[in-house]
Every structure is written in structure tokens, then in C-alpha cells.
Amino acid sequence: MEMGQIASTLKRLVLGFPIPVLFNEQLLERSCALDGGLSFVNTEIGTIYLHGMDQPNGAQYEFDVYLQGLPIYTSHSYTSHRHIIHLDSCRFHARLPDRDKLVDEADVIKRVKAVLAQTIEQRFIQMKATLSAEAFVGFYEMLRHWELLKLLNDVPVVPPEALREIIAYPVCDTEVFGNFEQRPEKAMTLEEIMDRGVVSIDDDIKQDGAGRYLFAWSRDYLLYHGTLDNGHWIHTLVRHLNDEELVIETVNESHQAQFQGDWCWVVVRFCEGYRIWLGRDVVEIRDQACYQGQENADDIIVPKGDCSAQVLQQMASFRSEYDEFQESTFESDSDAFIAFVVANTASDPANAMQRLLPDFCGCPALYGKAFVVELDQQGKPASVMAYPVQSGQTQTLEAGMGS
């Protein structure tokens, strides 16, 4: 064994050793030893140091086990945040001759985990009595992993991990189009939750439509993420929107038309706005289109205030059979849908032309000029002429357009 390997092995072996160890005249670190400065507690299996109890730092589920100061078991993880357990050598024994494995290891580790869980629970009960509610719920991840969420049942503050806010237009695929939900920035009190209202939604937007999400977004409701104990007080406040009948009615609907893109084919209903009813509550939306879902009307409602193609992000994820996002198809369908909306909502042909024309800021030669544009029966330019038309110009430009 090379000197470097010897040194690294010794450093690992002496971390929990009960007496100082010198190697090459250097004192080796014993940070996991009983006299290494950590705060240990006595238990039925030995002494335990609980890591991560001073301030929240994740679930804290990894641990190292020592017997007579030597490492004898470690849970599988690369994290350095670990609980330390020194087993009572009168009750537990190592297998000879190497003494690097426990006798009846599986049974011993099962008991170690049980006692570790009990010790963590006892510590949290003590902390609950001394910490503020906001500080205590900061340990949510660790409480959840150790199945101790019941300790939050009577705490008048909800951890942000249990709630979501709708911050953007709801879409059917958040991996492709981005998240429209996020955690609140801080824990929320009972009063804050009651003021805003909290709901649960169990809809797949592509299948069930975006109606309930748009309703909740319009009302600025909080979304319950369903992660607290069944006995938590928040369950008495959560309004389950899927338990209520969803009705969407248009306001001053003008007409319907069929959109035929490369990916999306769908009936589109044009209107001034639409109302979303859930129970006796209603919201009216005039600036966000809504897809009603494949299991419902399977159509799109476009109010007057939305001239975008964002609603296609509710209808389709534009993923191929190989789960790859088809960006070019998405962009072409989006451009086509915008033109489709303009064609169906423009007040007159000139208004439609103005809304459909691109930006010519990169062509200084066109600045201040006027043109006569003729479209063919498919809506494509048949001829473009400078205005006023000069003699012979029509034939020249028309020939150019056809070449």
C-alpha cells in the first residue's frame, strides 16, 4: 500500500477514535470522537450526535456507526452531513477477525434506525417548545423524512414547501414551457392563508383544461401541495375545486372557426370574454385564452384581449414520440395561430394588415415609403408596388414576385 493510501485510510479510521493518534508527527483529526466537541446524547444503543438540528439543512437522514471508536457501518451517501452513532460495546459486537462488520448487521442497523428516529423526535419536541413557529417549520424537510409531520399539526404557521402560488399563465408541460407555480417566499400564518384562501386542484391541463387553474389564478388563491399530516388544521380550510362542477360560459361570443396548424387542429370560439363558474363563485376573464381540455369541449376560448398564441401551450406539449420538443413546429403553429386570431378579430382589412405586418426596422431603405400590396386567394403577396405607382412599375414588380 502506498504512503498516500495509508494516510487516507488512517484518517478515515481515526475519525471516531477515543484517544489522540499521531501519524508522521501530525495529530490526526478525530471530529467524530466522543471528545471531539460534538454534543452527544445517551440512548439505549449508545451515544448519538444529531446533525442539522441547529438550523434547517435538508432531510438529514445519513449516519455513520462506530464501535469502540472504529467505523463499522455507514449509510450510502456522499454527503458530509451525517448523524454519528457510537454503539455500546457491551451490547454490540464486531465480526472477527477483521472487526469491520457488525454481528447480525441487518438487525442491528434496523434497531439503530429506530432509536435514531426516536431520538430525533424527542429533540424536535424539545425544540418545538423553545423555537418560534416560523423557525420550527423551517425543519419541514427533516420532519417529513423522519415521518414527524404530525408535530406541525398545531403550529399556526405553514411551511412554504406545503404551498404554491400561481405566478404565470398555466401550461400543460412545465418542463418545456416553464413553471407557472412557485413556493411562497416565506412560511405563511393562519391569518394570511385565511385572507387569501387555499385550494387544491387535481387537473391535467391537457386532459381536463385550464379552467380551474385560471379561476384560482384570477382569485390569487394559494394551492395546497398535499404534503402535511392528515390531522393538520389546514385541511379544514382547503377548498377542493375538483369536487365542484366547472362551468365556462362565453360573453358575447361572435363566431367559431377551425384552426389548422402543423401540430394543433382545434375549434376556436371568439368572444368579448368568458366566465368561469365553480359552485356559486364566478370570475370573468377578458385577457387570457383558455383551452377546455380533451375530456371536455376540446376547444379554445379566445377573448378579445388575448391576441397571443400562448393558449397552444395548454393544448399541446409539442413533444415527439421520442419525447423531444419540436421547437420549429411550435414556433410555426404559434405564428399561424396569431395570424389566425388577427384574421378572425380584426375590425376591417386595413386593421388586419396593420396587425399582421412585421417590423421593418432593419430595412432603412423602406423608411418613409408607401406601398400597394395585393394578396392572392391564399393570402400570400401577389404583388408589391411603390406608391404612387410609376409608369410600367406594376408589370415589373409583378413579374419579380412570380420569379
What do these predicted ranges mean?
Residues 10:
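Phosphate/anion-contacting hairpin/loop surfaces
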Residues 13:
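Short, conserved catalytic or adaptor-binding loops enriched in Gly and charged residues
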Residues 4-7, 16-120, 152-194, 203-204, ...:
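GHKL/Histidine-kinase-like ATPase module
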Residues 112-154:
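Hydrophobic alpha-helical interaction segments
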Residues 41, 144-403:
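Charge-rich (often acidic), low-complexity intrinsically disordered regions concentrated
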